[in-house]
Each structure stands twice: as structure tokens, then as C-alpha cells.
């Protein structure tokens, strides 16, 4: 996937997983597509000058069926006045639609270095154990 962006784009990727619970295949598919789009955006836009981008992916599952996927980069962040709930191209539209399909929330923090995106899927067996910050619903 990242290789299709050209050899001039470099990424240092760190992945951390916690929890021993499995998620439904449909949920895994949606979460995987959202993660792929977030990684692609990080490589394409985090460092417009072409510097390597550092990206951390964190995946967490809980007994109640809830899960969290967090993708954080060290880039320049969103452009001024960019609203991830309404702006963006086809990739952001896709992420919002997939988030709706999961009945999940896609949260963005971008007030510091880079962008932090969190996909939070509440549990299907009761209340979610994953802490959630104010969210951007998949509009």
C-alpha cells in the first residue's frame, strides 16, 4: 500500500497491540480500511518536504467487544481551518462511511505536533471499557 506512493516517501512504523479478544470479521475489515487510509494520509501529508514520517498504531480490544485503533503521526497536522468531520476528499468520506457502518466514533486531535486519530468502537456486550474523549461521529 505505502509502496504505491513512490520510493521518495518513507515511514517509520511502530505497532502496539493489547488485549487477547477477537473482533468480528466485518468490524476488522472496516477498521483495517480506516487504518489503511489513515496510514496513507500520514505518509502523503505529514511531511510535505518529504522527510520520513513516524507513525504509531495502537490496537486495543476488551472483553465486552469494544476496541480502539489509534494512529498518530509526527507531521505538520491538518491545514488551518480543516475540519475532518466535513472536509477532505474521497478518503475522508470513506472513513466517515465506514465509521457509521461500525456504529463507532472517529476522533481527531491535531492541536499539537501531527495528527492523532482514534477509532473507538463501543462494546456489543454492555458498556465500553475504552476511555473516550469528545468525539467526531462518523457523519
Task: Indicate residue ranges for each PLM-predicted region.
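Flexible, glycine-/charge-rich segments associated with ATP-binding catalytic modules
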Residues: 4, 8, 13, 33, ...
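Short beta-strand/loop element within the Bergerat-fold HATPase_c
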Residues: 52-65
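Acidic ATP/Mg2+-coordinating residue in the GHKL
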Residues: 73
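Conserved short strand/loop->alpha-helix "switch" segment adjacent to the catalytic nucleotide/phosphoryl-transfer site
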Residues: 6-37, 43-51
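Active-site-proximal flexible loops/turns
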Residues: 48, 80-81
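Glycine-rich G1-box
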Residues: 76-77
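Structural preference for long, well-ordered alpha-helical segments in enzyme cores
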Residues: 1, 31-42, 59, 94
